[in-house]
Amino acid sequence: MAAIKLRQRRKDDLMDRKKITNFLGNLLVQEKFSGMGKYWAREVSIDPWAAKGKPKRVDFMQFVPDGQCAVSAIERGIFVCYEIKSCKKDVYSGNGLNFLGEKNYIVTTMECYKELLQDLRDGTFARHLYEVAPGSSFHFGIMVAVPFMSEITDEFENPTKIDSENGRWKLSVIKQCNPGLRTRPMAELLFCMLRSGH
């Protein structure tokens, strides 16, 4: 009986994680990628034919040109990578965290951010990032989902449970990303985005 309850709890947990992941992904698309002049792709595969353990996939990748009227403006564009993480367990799953852009963000819940705070401060997260994704940039920020009319400080004190059915939500940057250098060529990343599509 206990084993059945444990299996059911794991199944419910997985469903909750899946719902939260979908919610965060849809919110990101709605907030950051809608409108004209937005260049982005979902589930961008990098090195898909590499040996086992080497292929990378970025949940969302965006190309932000400096302008669109001159080639030089396009060449000055930057890449922003977004990794969706529903909970702390998801962060440490060994999947994702492929920070290949000049800017990179973890998109998560306030609850998950609060659980990660100590690991961010004491270097636990940095060590994990280096172990599971050695080519990833340490230039990353964190965005959290908060109810539309809420202040981020209030949400930090008393997080609202994610509920896609009720109310409007927004993404707020709780940890800024300082841009870093990209190691992959622009042509390669644009090709990977094009191959992945939406």
Regions from the PLM with identified roles:
Residues 53-81, 87, 95-99:
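Active-site beta-strand-loop-beta-strand hairpin of nuclease catalytic cores
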Residues 2-31, 35-40, 48-52, 124-198:
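Non-catalytic C-terminal interaction segments of nucleic acid-processing enzymes
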Residues 35, 76, 99-101, 137:
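Short, well-ordered coil/turn elements that cap or connect secondary structure elements
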Residues 82, 105, 141-143:
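Hydrophobic/aromatic beta-strand patches that form the interior of the parallel beta-sheet core
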Residues 15-26, 81, 86, 91-99:
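Accessory alpha/beta interaction modules
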Residues 85-133:
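Short, charged, amphipathic alpha-helix that recurs within catalytic cores of restriction-modification
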Residues 44-46, 62-64, 85-88, 110:
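Short, flexible loop/turn elements at secondary-structure junctions
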Residues 61-69, 109-121, 146-148:
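Short regulatory "switch" loops immediately downstream of catalytic or recognition motifs
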